Amino acid sequence: MRAIPLLSLLLSGWFIVPAHADEAQDWLIRLGQAEQQQSFHGTFVYERNGSFSTHNIWHRVQNGEVRERLLQLDGSAQEVVRIDGHTQCVSGTLIAGLGDSPNSAARPLDPQKLKNWYELAVIGKSRVAGRDAVIVSLTPRDQHRYGFELHLDKQTGLPLKSLLLNDKGQLLERFQFTSLDTDEVPSDKDLLADADCKPITLDSDKASAVKTAQVWHSDWLPPGFELTSSTSHKDPETKTQVNSLMYDDGLARFSVFLEPLNGATVTDTRTQLGPTVAVSRRLTTPQGEMMVTVVGEIPIGTAERIALSMRNNDGAATSKQ
């Protein structure tokens, strides 16, 4: 389970002593280990853009496999089942941020790398879902990513609560357990998806995916973000080949989607819902016009700059303003 991202930081960076940074790294290591070693089930609340939803989660680690099931309890039933971070089935329209793309399993947390892009600190203690927690803050060192405040369970290292704020201190996203049981291991029945949970089949063209990573690049990326994977598949509606490139800094992530327009008339767009932004820009290449779309939990100005920086290695590519 990804620790879904900060209440306003109460301590300025110059109050943070190195010992706190070392302690914060230790807690992040525990967090990474807990999600790969600790079974649990519980109920959590997810808040975004002023809207709340409640979810059950079952997370089982067994024989080296991490199996997870999420079920939304409010409104129409929405469900997702994952194995080792890869989505197996979904139902309903999952809230963005809770359901990742089928093949976008997160990389293990690496505090040594993260401290290059975030200031890490233990800033206090709290109590969440009846459990004692340690508060770890990750404050971005630049304007190209958001900050996190993680309330980690003292007993297991699991994230009991996480908050995400923009550079103005506004809450973008909240994840918080209301109950958590780490003693009982979820059963096969607990992890069994309902009949409405439709299997995910990704018709990925591996050869095209490799070519995408070779042909496309960005002239500019936020410091610390690296290409982690690429995919290519045919859109069932437009019948065009959609290529995507995925980047992350070890915590935040975004995707770049590239699709030929084939003469279609489209307009540039920029939208934001909570922490998730989507910026689309038309790009002229020797092979024709393309639509470049950047989607992720990054500031909208950063997403726009990335979209305008995409280049085709086969020849010059220019964005249309």
Q: Where are the model-predicted features located?
A:
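Intrinsically disordered, low-complexity linker/loop segments enriched in Gly/Pro
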Residues: 102-148
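An acidic-aromatic
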Residues: 49, 53-107, 164-178, 182
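Short, solvent-exposed coil/turn segments at beta-strand boundaries
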Residues: 35-37, 59-67, 81-86, 131, ...
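Short, surface-exposed coil-to-beta transition loops
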Residues: 52-56, 75, 144-148, 160, ...
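N-terminal leader/targeting segments and the immediate start of mature chains
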Residues: 2-5, 10-66, 113-115, 125-127, ...
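Short, solvent-exposed recognition patches
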Residues: 199-287, 298-301, 305
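Gly/Pro-enriched, hydrophobic low-complexity segments
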Residues: 129-197, 271-272
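Short, hydrophobic/aromatic-rich segments at coil-to-beta transitions
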Residues: 37-43, 64-69, 130-137, 158-161, ...
